[in-house]
């Protein structure tokens, strides 16, 4: 394919960035930057950088599995060293070991032997069994005195068990943990070891150390010859030695260095200076909204609040209001007053300061009435030491020469820190004094370092460089921005540099998984509220034709909140006439033309005549609030007695407001992610537009508003194309377009459409039937065809999915707009990022018995709390234990096949006399097992986990698929067997030199399969190893095609053609892959 070389285009690039997608659109603009035509658009989709169901890091599962493997390996090595020690000290002889180095005929009653060792001499084998058992099960060793105050529930349960057993040993009823286990655990609960999620049988390693010492003493008394000092020292070392936690320099190395002082390490968050910096940032940014104006705190107010967080454990907004003596009409900016008791939320909490103070109080080292008397420098040192070091020993080593022993002991008992900030203590100590004078953080940084972001790279290049991972720590955001960068650079390579870039990021970008779930929860609640409101509307208006629209429902909602009265006149509104055209109107209390505020908090229900009289004035101006007129007082009373939320009342009653500030806030999205990306692009990319501000972050609410006004229908559930729709709107949100809309709304508010009106600013004739300004004529029709390939995007039409069909459709439907058909028009094809990662989980976690693998069967031990009725039918020895089978079945059926509920209470077997006997916790279940991964020296088998690649071969006009798993990659195995339907792996087709290698497939590689019946073109989703069929994902994931956008069970062996394609990040360059040699797995 020849390289695409377009003519020079003056265009705006619009981006709609989500956590798993980037929609993009190019809109050409004229010299005044008015949108004039749609050049190109598309969607890039990728996997979010987290576990979808839990929000966990993708690395967490690997990290936990690696941790378990390390523990297992270290335990095995510890036991090996113990066996070697026993042989070296003469406890055991060479004849006692088998060919694998394991001890022959080792007694299997170690708990009983540990108790017996207190009263009699043990044989060498018995003594070996005891010592090995202590080394294998060596309890829990805490390295911090204050570990019991953890918020980790699992660790808390473990520590509770350790403490309880330590207390039981101190009573003197039991000499050792072994005696306690035999005489208490086994008798009371029937088992000695911990069970699932129960840590009540855990011992402290120090208690086990005491038992070891006592055992050596007793065995020496009984004449055991194998109690030498060397053996005791070696065993005790193996018992007590533990790898130190990552701390000190290792932690600092991982954290990196200061933004402003590159040679300095980042400061601990729980230092005095860092906490004061955080407080000063909040204090200096705090704004009061009062009588319509916004203001910062005065110097006196700042001084009043400055030391309050040190006096109170938590400083709330309500406390701040009282201290500042604010009037009831004053509010804190940024606080969500919609929720109950909003001002009860915390303004500032000095966690470290008060943690240190409480620790000293608990140990009687601080007078409750006096302030903390440790210097700021010493508190910084304490915060740093307790954040960097993870053991009492290391912390003591750092602080022993700085603070008194009794204070250090108190702190070790009660505090633990771990968080860090991005700035060093050195930088903070330079910045904080300026912030204490009232300067904002950015102002203080600019004064000291010259720039808020430290050393800034201002070199402009044609292409955007990589997003710095050290500045964007959230992996979900980093991947989204990195994919956006690929799209930007792809557009520039294809079309040249844009004049401007407009960006909208989805609300969830930059939010934690928990926050995103909260957003989803609120959206679901809002959806249910709308359904209830719609049902209520139909009750009030049973004769209403069709489904009520959001505007109809909003009228009823405002009617109820305003107690059925017009907010401007106070007159009663006739509910029966609510839907009568012109009778009532929804008005923007603060004129939209002056604020661009279309939020619910700016909407009121008024009689049509009152709305016309008000025009584009604020209520304060309309009712002559400046002179405190009677009308203004009555209006205030109506607002105050309404059921509006507090924040809405505040907005409606605004007396003064900054129009430019309102527009700036409502048109721009100032979240950190947007600010970062805008600044990053502006500083590093060469853009051709006029003026300084050439990168703009659009507000999502404005995008929704314009999309609705411009007649663009968006249904998220249908397919992935809708991301491009928003990108078009974002691109068209130019300053020139905003000005047009502002003028239109202003004239409409002023009821200026009386016949013909001349716009004095432009000379444009405005007619009474003038519609909302569009970017260009037939805008909605053109955009919907370009995005969905159908007239108005309606599903009943056939999609114009080829270049010729799309241009023909545009020419037919938009005959009056020939500009819609041009050389850059191409069908939208969603680009999906392929996953070519070759590593992954080696095998599934569950290991099954492989004794009957030759029968095609494996045996799995299934806990009763996970046993379903279908599993029960495959229970091993079902015929030999019919009573057990029937009892389990009855319990499950009684609880509707919910095993968690069915076996919440213990389940027991009963003898012939009906007496309760053994507790049943799990049963063995047969499973079909054709293949898998051998583990545990070929004694167990586990299911295959990740299929990372499928290699495609061809021979005699037939195609053969060879699946490759991550465990094969790890071992460097390149498989040579192709799937044969219904056959075991050993009977699969052997691939030799007579087969031709075609290509390798990874998830989301673009493929084409042509059969006698159909042509399928989409992204490879998966391969079924039992049938050799593949699943193909439709490019836009149209849920009306296949199963939720996926074509399943496509046979490729006898396909007429099977081809892999390459696609760029824009979905524009699609070409067949070139033939290559078969790649290795590593």
Swiss-Prot record:
Coexpression with both gRNAs or a synthetic gRNA in human embryonic or pluripotent stem cells shows it is possible to target and modify a DNA sequence of interest. Its cofactor is Mg(2+). The keyword RNA-binding applies. Mg(2+) 1 binds at residues 16, 504, 508. GO terms for molecular function: DNA binding; endonuclease activity; metal ion binding; RNA binding. GO terms for biological process: defense response to virus; maintenance of CRISPR repeat elements. Gene3D superfamilies: Ribonuclease H-like superfamily/Ribonuclease H (3.30.420.10). Changing residue 16 to A: Does not restore CRISPR interference during plasmid transformation to deletion mutant. Disruption phenotype: Almost no mature crRNA or tracrRNA produced. Loss of CRISPR interference during plasmid transformation. Residues 512-667 form the HNH Cas9-type domain. Its EC number is 3.1.-.-. Keywords: Antiviral defense, DNA-binding, Endonuclease, Hydrolase, Magnesium, Manganese, Metal-binding, Nuclease, RNA-binding. CRISPR (clustered regularly interspaced short palindromic repeat) is an adaptive immune system that provides protection against mobile genetic elements (viruses, transposable elements and conjugative plasmids). CRISPR clusters contain spacers, sequences complementary to antecedent mobile elements, and target invading nucleic acids. CRISPR clusters are transcribed and processed into CRISPR RNA (crRNA). NCBIfam families: cas_Csn1. Belongs to the CRISPR-associated protein Cas9 family. Subtype II-C subfamily. Has 2 endonuclease domains. The discontinuous RuvC-like domain cleaves the target DNA noncomplementary to crRNA while the HNH nuclease domain cleaves the target DNA complementary to crRNA. This is CRISPR-associated endonuclease Cas9. It comes from Neisseria meningitidis serogroup C (strain 8013).
């Amino acid at each position: 394919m020849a390289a695409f070389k377009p003519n020079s285009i003056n265009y705006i690039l619009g981006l709609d960035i989500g956590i798993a997608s980037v929609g993009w659109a190019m809109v050409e603009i004229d010299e005044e930057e008015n949108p004039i035509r749609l050049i190109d658009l598309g969607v890039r989709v990728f996997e979010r950088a987290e576990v979808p169901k839990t929000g966990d890091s993708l690395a967490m599962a690997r990290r936990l599995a690696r941790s378990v493997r390390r523990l297992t390996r270290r335990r095995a090595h510890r036991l090996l060293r113990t066996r070697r020690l026993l042989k070296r000290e003469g406890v055991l002889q060479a004849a006692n070991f088998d060919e694998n180095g394991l001890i022959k005929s080792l007694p299997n009653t170690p708990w009983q032997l540990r108790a017996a060792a207190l009263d009699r001499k043990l044989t060498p084998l018995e003594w070996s069994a005891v010592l090995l058992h202590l080394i294998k099960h060596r309890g829990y060793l805490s390295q911090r005195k204050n570990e019991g105050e953890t918020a980790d529930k699992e660790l808390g349960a473990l520590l509770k068990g350790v403490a309880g057993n330590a207390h039981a040993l101190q009573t003197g009823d039991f000499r050792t943990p072994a005696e306690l286990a035999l005489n208490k655990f086994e008798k009371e609960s029937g088992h000695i070891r911990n069970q699932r999620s129960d840590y009540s049988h855990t011992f402290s390693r120090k208690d086990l150390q005491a038992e070891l010492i006592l055992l050596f003493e007793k065995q020496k008394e009984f004449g055991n010859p194998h109690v030498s000092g060397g053996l005791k020292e070696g065993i005790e070392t193996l018992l007590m030695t533990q790898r130190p936690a990552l701390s000190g320099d290792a932690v600092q190395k991982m954290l990196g260095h200061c933004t402003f002082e590159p040679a300095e390490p980042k400061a601990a968050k729980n230092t005095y200076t860092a906490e004061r910096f955080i407080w000063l940032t909040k204090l200096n940014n705090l704004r009061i909204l009062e009588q319509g104006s916004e203001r910062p705190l005065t110097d006196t107010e700042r001084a009043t609040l400055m030391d309050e967080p040190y006096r109170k454990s938590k400083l709330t907004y309500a406390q701040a209001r009282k201290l500042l003596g604010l009037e009831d009409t004053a509010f804190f900016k940024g606080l969500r007053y919609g929720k109950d008791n909003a001002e009860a939320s915390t303004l500032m909490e000095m966690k470290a300061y008060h943690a240190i103070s409480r620790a000293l109080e608990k140990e009687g080292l601080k007078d409750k009435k006096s302030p903390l008397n440790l210097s700021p420098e010493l508190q910084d040192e304490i915060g740093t030491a307790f954040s960097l070091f993870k053991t009492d020993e290391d912390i003591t080593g750092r602080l022993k020469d700085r603070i008194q022993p009794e204070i250090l002991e108190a702190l070790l008992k009660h505090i633990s820190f771990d968080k860090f900030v991005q700035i060093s203590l050195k930088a903070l100590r330079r910045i904080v004094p300026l912030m204490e004078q009232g300067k904002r953080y950015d102002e203080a940084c600019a004064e000291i370092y010259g720039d808020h972001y430290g050393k800034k790279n201002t070199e402009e290049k044609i292409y955007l460089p990589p997003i710095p991972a050290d500045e964007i720590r959230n992996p979900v955001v980093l991947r989204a921005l990195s994919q956006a960068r690929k799209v930007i650079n792809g557009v520039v390579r294809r079309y040249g540099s844009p004049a401007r870039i407009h960006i909208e990021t989805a609300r969830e970008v930059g939010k934690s998984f928990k926050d995103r779930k909260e957003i989803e929860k609120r959206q679901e609640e809002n959806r249910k509220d709308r359904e209830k409101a719609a049902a209520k509307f139909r009750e009030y208006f049973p004769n209403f034709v069709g489904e009520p629209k959001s505007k109809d429902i909003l009228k009823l909602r405002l009617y109820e909140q305003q107690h059925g009265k017009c907010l401007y006149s106070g007159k009663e509104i006739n509910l029966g006439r609510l839907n009568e055209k012109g009778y009532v109107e929804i008005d923007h209390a603060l004129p939209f033309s002056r604020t661009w505020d279309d939020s619910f908090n700016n909407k009121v229900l008024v009689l049509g005549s009152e709305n016309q009289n008000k025009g584009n004035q604020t209520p304060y101006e309309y009712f002559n609030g400046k002179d405190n007129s009677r009308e203004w007082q009555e209006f205030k009373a109506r607002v105050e007695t309404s059921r509006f939320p507090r924040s809405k009342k505040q907005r409606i009653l605004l007396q003064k407001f900054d129009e430019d500030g309102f527009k700036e806030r409502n048109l721009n999205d100032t979240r950190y992610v947007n600010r970062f990306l805008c600044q990053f692009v502006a500083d590093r990319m060469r853009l051709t537009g006029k003026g300084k501000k050439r990168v703009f972050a659009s507000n999502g609410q404005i995008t929704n508003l314009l999309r609705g006004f411009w007649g663009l229908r968006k249904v998220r559930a249908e397919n992935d194309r809708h991301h491009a729709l928003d990108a078009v709107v974002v691109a068209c949100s130019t300053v020139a377009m905003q000005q047009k809309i502002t003028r239109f709304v202003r004239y409409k508010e002023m009821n200026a459409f009386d016949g013909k009106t001349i716009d004095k600013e432009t000379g444009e004739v405005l007619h009474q039937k003038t519609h909302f300004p569009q970017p260009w004529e037939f805008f909605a029709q053109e955009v919907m065809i370009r995005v969905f390939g159908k007239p108005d995007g309606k599903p009943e039409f056939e999609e114009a999915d080829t270049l010729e069909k799309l241009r023909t459709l545009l020419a037919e439907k938009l005959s009056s707009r020939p500009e819609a058909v041009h050389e850059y028009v191409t069908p939208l094809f969603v680009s999906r990022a392929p996953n070519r990662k070759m590593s992954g989980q080696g095998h599934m976690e569950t290991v099954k018995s492989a004794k009957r693998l030759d029968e095609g069967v494996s045996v799995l031990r299934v806990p009763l709390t996970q046993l379903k009725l279908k599993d029960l039918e495959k229970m091993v020895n079902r015929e030999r234990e019919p009573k057990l089978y029937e009892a389990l079945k009855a319990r499950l059926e009684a609880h509707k096949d919910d095993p968690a509920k069915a076996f919440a209470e213990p389940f027991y077997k009963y003898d012939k006399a009906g007496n309760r006997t053994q507790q049943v916790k799990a049963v063995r279940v047969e499973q079909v097992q054709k293949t898998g991964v051998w583990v545990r020296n070929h004694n167990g088998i586990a299911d295959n986990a990740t299929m990372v690649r499928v290699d495609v071969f061809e021979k005699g006009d037939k195609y053969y698929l060879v699946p490759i798993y991550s465990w094969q990659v790890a071992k460097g195995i390149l498989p040579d067997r192709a799937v044969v339907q219904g056959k075991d792996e050993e009977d699969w087709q052997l691939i030799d030199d007579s087969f031709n290698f075609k290509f390798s497939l990874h998830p989301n590689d673009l493929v084409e399969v042509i059969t006698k019946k159909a042509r399928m073109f989409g992204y490879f989703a998966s391969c079924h190893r039992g049938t050799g069929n593949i699943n193909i994902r439709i490019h836009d994931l149209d849920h009306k095609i296949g199963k939720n956008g996926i074509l399943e069970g496509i046979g490729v062996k006898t396909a007429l053609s099977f081809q892999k394609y390459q696609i760029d990040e824009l979905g524009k360059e699609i070409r067949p892959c070139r033939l290559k040699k078969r790649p290795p797995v590593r």
